[in-house]
């Protein structure tokens, strides 16, 4: 997921978030959706419930970043558009189901609700 925040985080940072939409793209390995989320505990971001609540310029910045972020690796990225909060929730449900089907997965690291 891509979490919208005002301050930097760090790899492995865990926080409670809610989805507000999804950015559809594909790279050389296939579909690579980016579920866009906001932190539940952040009073600045948690009022957003759908991509329509996000500043349109920020949407353009996110899209532009993912269009060019693999250019230096000479890899192609196909931008396939945006989906709403319901589509994001469907993707998360599918991902959660796949995760829950994994045998011998580590327990207690985090939870997906």
Regions found by a protein language model. Give the residues of each.
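Hydrophobic N-terminal alpha-helices or hydrophobic patches in metabolic proteins across all domains
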Residues: 1-113
């Amino acid at each position: 997921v891509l979490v919208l925040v005002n301050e930097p985080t760090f790899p492995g940072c865990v926080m409670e978030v809610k989805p507000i939409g999804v950015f559809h793209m594909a790279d050389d390995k296939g579909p690579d959706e980016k579920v866009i989320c906001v932190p539940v505990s952040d009073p600045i971001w948690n009022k957003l419930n759908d991509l329509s609540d996000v500043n349109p310029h920020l949407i353009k910045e996110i899209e532009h970043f993912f269009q060019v972020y693999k250019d230096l690796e000479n890899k192609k990225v196909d931008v396939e558009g945006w989906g709403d909060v319901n589509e994001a929730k469907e993707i998360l449900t599918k991902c959660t189901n796949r995760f829950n089907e994994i045998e011998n997965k580590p327990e207690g690291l985090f939870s997906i609700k």
